[in-house]
Swiss-Prot record:
UniProt keyword annotations, A-Z: Disulfide bond, Electron transport, Transport
Protein name per its UniProtKB record: Glutaredoxin-like protein C5orf63
Family membership noted in the UniProt record: Belongs to the glutaredoxin family. YDR286C subfamily.
Gene: C5orf63
Natural source organism: Homo sapiens
Keyword Disulfide bond in annotation: yes
Amino acid sequence: MLWFQGNSMQLARSSFGLFLRNCSASKTTLPVLTLFTKDPCPLCDEAKEVLKPYENRQPYKDQKLPGTRRRRSPSSPSHPHMASQSGKRYNLTLNQVLSFDYDMGLDAPKTISSDCGAFYCLRMFKSPDMTCCFYPKQ
């Protein structure tokens, strides 16, 4: 009888601890990922498809940009890349950008860009104060 009572008390304690942890986790607010898009934009559509599985874990807001003004960066290649604050450049796909691990010891990437017109920005998952901008081809 004592053995059963001891196990049930231990189970009750661990269940109560999980309950408290879940209650405190529900009070934390996640940063909202802001996706600036422009119609038509194939890279923006690709980003939305990549983000679809994460909708329930990471909230994001779709912000439409007006206008068709072209933006050019003299040093950027024709495909998206990421530049760190120290000036290093990483040639990455959108999937690699979204899963970039800031704990790898690398400088945290600052911007993503390429030589095209419309742009959109992604606020990174692990670093909510960091924004990455894409300039997709038109």
